[in-house]
From Swiss-Prot:
Gene3D superfamilies assigned to the protein according to its UniProt record, in alphabetical order: 1.20.5.110, YVTN repeat-like/Quinoprotein amine dehydrogenase
Organism from which the protein derives: Homo sapiens
Assembly description: Interacts with STX1A and STX4.
Name of the featured protein: Syntaxin-binding protein 5-like
SUPFAM superfamilies: SNARE fusion complex, WD40 repeat-like
Signal peptide span: none
Function recorded in the entry: Plays a role in vesicle trafficking and exocytosis inhibition. In pancreatic beta-cells, inhibits insulin secretion probably by interacting with and regulating STX1A and STX4, key t-SNARE proteins involved in the fusion of insulin granules to the plasma membrane. Also plays a role in neurotransmitter release by inhibiting basal acetylcholine release from axon terminals and by preventing synaptic fatigue upon repetitive stimulation. Promotes as well axonal outgrowth.
Amino acid sequence: MKKFNFRKVLDGLTASSPGSGSSSGSNSGGGAGSGSVHPAGTAGVLREEIQETLTSEYFQICKTVRHGFPHQPTALAFDPVQKILAIGTRTGAIRILGRPGVDCYCQHESGAAVLQLQFLINEGALVSASSDDTLHLWNLRQKRPAILHSLKFNRERITYCHLPFQSKWLYVGTERGNTHIVNIESFILSGYVIMWNKAIELSTKTHPGPVVHLSDSPRDEGKLLIGYENGTVVFWDLKSKRAELRVYYDEAIHSIDWHHEGKQFMCSHSDGSLTLWNLKSPSRPFQTTIPHGKSQREGRKSESCKPILKVEYKTCKNSEPFIIFSGGLSYDKACRRPSLTIMHGKAITVLEMDHPIVEFLTLCETPYPNEFQEPYAVVVLLEKDLIVVDLTQSNFPIFENPYPMDIHESPVTCTAYFADCPPDLILVLYSIGVKHKKQGYSNKEWPISGGAWNLGAQTYPEIIITGHADGSIKFWDASAITLQMLYKLKTSKVFEKQKVGEGKQTCEIVEEDPFAIQMIYWCPESRIFCVSGVSAYVIIYKFSRHEITTEIVSLEVRLQYDVEDIITPEPETSPPFPDLSAQLPSSRSLSGSTNTVASEGVTKDSIPCLNVKTRPVRMPPGYQAELVIQLVWVDGEPPQQITSLAVSSAYGIVAFGNCNGLAVVDFIQKTVLLSMGTIDLYRSSDLYQRQPRSPRKNKQFIADNFCMRGLSNFYPDLTKRIRTSYQSLTELNDSPVPLELERCKSPTSDHVNGHCTSPTSQSCSSGKRLSSADVSKVNRWGPGRPPFRKAQSAACMEISLPVTTEENRENSYNRSRSSSISSIDKDSKEAITALYFMDSFARKNDSTISPCLFVGTSLGMVLIISLNLPLADEQRFTEPVMVLPSGTFLSLKGAVLTFSCMDRMGGLMQPPYEVWRDPNNIDENEKSWRRKVVMNSSSASQEIGDHQYTIICSEKQAKVFSLPSQTCLYVHNITETSFILQANVVVMCSSACLACFCANGHIMIMSLPSLRPMLDVNYLPLTDMRIARTFCFTNEGQALYLVSPTEIQRLTYSQEMCDNLQDMLGDLFTPIETPEAQNRGFLKGLFGGSGQTFDREELFGEASAGKASRSLAQHIPGPGSIEGMKGAAGGVMGELTRARIALDERGQRLGELEEKTAGMMTSAEAFSKHAHELMLKYKDKKWYQF
């Protein structure tokens, strides 16, 4: 007996009501509304045949790992026993690094900048001081660190912290010059305070300034060295509570470091000098040097230099000490880069850096400050890089960094993410890329080797591809939540280098970064790789293991089209689409080759933006350029940037489009098959009756005004924002911009995994793009999209001339954001936003599948173009390919973003592909060779009838059509108040689903083909442009986005991966015995000073020091224990962890009970003793003696 489905009854009732397919409302958060439609009787049959296995229990959103260099770093710390490194940032983030695979990200909820970090050495804890004057204690003994305690200072600002080795008391210096002491275990302030007016001499009337240094003496832990900004240093006796000695210097102090014997210390000053002080003669420096100052005549002071911001004085047992400092260069060398100076004996080595130095630390063999330090490396934290210098070799080489700290080497402009790739790809790419690695690194192992990490159970090959502003492409191995660079491709090598002065003549669309990558398409199976750049070019690459020297083939395409500005009908009104399959004339095919002619003073025509190399080029193994396609200038108009891209290795065809039209190129025969304006694709069935016209002279100016007036109501400072350069997205000052405004700024799209995902226009390719629109002379738009974006039309309108404030004001008018249908949406210019190759049904009456190209536009229109390929394999290299619009039209609300197809059983159909073969393998070329094309097995053996689903997603809704009948089976209005930025059809647990990322921050998952909502989570309440332009989904529940200019954030929407995440993360803390201190020897202990320890608890505890004022600091309990349980519960050891915590809590309560019992017994004994004494006292007295 067949199971009764009540939902189908409701769906049938819904279908019978008018407008049921598109009238569903949106939720309160601007998320999803839904409606289902099945107009034809066949739909109900198909729905019964498909058993959807996905349920909402399969989905959950969770951040997994963050890769890249910490954005805007501010602080650095190192645990010499655990060998882990911590980096704090200006945004309140902390990154903790260990061995490769051990990479943890933490975030302060307040978002305040991290001022300083201090490890509790070998105890699995970290103290952070933030700019909101709060101290935090982090527990590192769990995979997801959490805050245990916080201490908020209310009346003083924190400037410096110091935690002695194996001490439980933290010294905290403040801006007022006072020094407070905090108990690390309880995070409570001690009553012991060193006031600034008691530390300095009574005769001194001026304030010494903030505390810039605190450290205890290596010889005597009872003595504290306090450095003040104005040049005063105080040696404070903690026991006697008085200053033992004071040091005064004319120049401000930046840092201080001890000699390990505790008899001398070194200071760095603002005049570029280093002073060495001896405790026995504090009246003047024992030695004063200006390392980079010019030597003057006798009697004159050396020339002052730039401040030395930090100095470290490290001793060696068998060699001269190391003096390492940053800064201190001479002022006359203004052009010199930031440097780190290493002084070892008489040798002075200056290491120049590419970026300003934020902080550095010397790594030493021992954690004990009173032993020979034996430094072996220096960690240098730069503004945009992290390097480690090997001190054990005389030439001071750097270590090869195993972390992906160079993602931002050139600003990232687009990303692509591929999960479950062919397993041999990673090895192949690595073997090619390793040959091009830099040489000269240290041969020692990476010194930051702490923590523990294993692969985990859930591993499959994953590859991330990033496109960059300099035209480079990087392939990354992203398997097992790690990231390692495999291979780097430089696309700029196919072009001639621009000579000085040539840029304005031929490349006016972009002055800076003309090679910036917009879109990426990659077919892992065929290894075909294709990119489009900001200068309106497309390059097709083929992979080869052999080096070749050959000429680069190039084609030039004219793709410039204009129409009359006729107001279009409302997008909600779906016009009729007649079947024109029988009456369409043959398509117009334009020759793609043109002669490049340019002369000064003549209107530019048929000139590409870049010049392809004409001489033979040596191409190393890896990806080698097969064909370069460039759009050219037409009648003085620059080519529009490409907004959509798709490649089919099986068909040997590449298609791309922009706001003017569509171009289709045969990259096997190197010929242009189609170069047509968007209107011509409709032919006689143009729904909006637009007429072609010749290009107008002031087109760009009109477009500028037209778009500006619609945007001026959204943001008052729009003119300035629209003209921000492309680098504004990738600079370090990353200021969020409202996405609703961003919607109006980006007409192009982003593509991932062969499908498009973009805010307004999109194409079927695998990557994201940085879109077009030239603004005046500067035309560098942020990673992935152009400067503005239209909701329903004209997604690629150019902006080339500036708009004055008066013009902007005149053209502006008031309208609500909800009414997206306005004049800006009704322009007749229609951009190609999505492309997709698939074997499908081009027309209604087709009975067999054939090669097709699906074309989506910014007006929500979908056109199917039929591809007629030669039948015989040998003829494919000689016979022409016919390209013909089929006359089939489908419509949606909003710009089309992505396509996909499913078979009648609900299986996701993959486009056909050609099996990879090395094009330069001599052995294979000698044999008779035929192209081996892999077709989708399910699509190749289907019977006649409605047996293919086509999934189409736009900015507003998703629809599922049955082909060839073109019946709309399902429609889902995803959002009404917002719009979709990224969409992709992905595989999850062997089933297909539609994943969407909305401008309001919602991530939504829908099952296919029914489009039932599976997940709707408000993941990013405060989104910004960078996230919107780089967000991409892939299979197996994975996604990523560029969270900052230097970091990639990966997340999962898979419940299974969320459950197993704890097992995949690395351990930050591993049990290691603390090394024993060296034996000082009898004589050294006798004459070397009082090196014995003293009881800090007795000195700083409440019993002797009293309680601190409650108004001075506020203790805030942290969520560490709760977070620790949540983190442990996610792994296999969750139950054991909970049991252990319960036992610990029970043991703690029993311990407290035992203490109370012991206290009561003590009290009882005291009472008994007192009663006995009282009895003895009055035992022999008479009654009258009382």
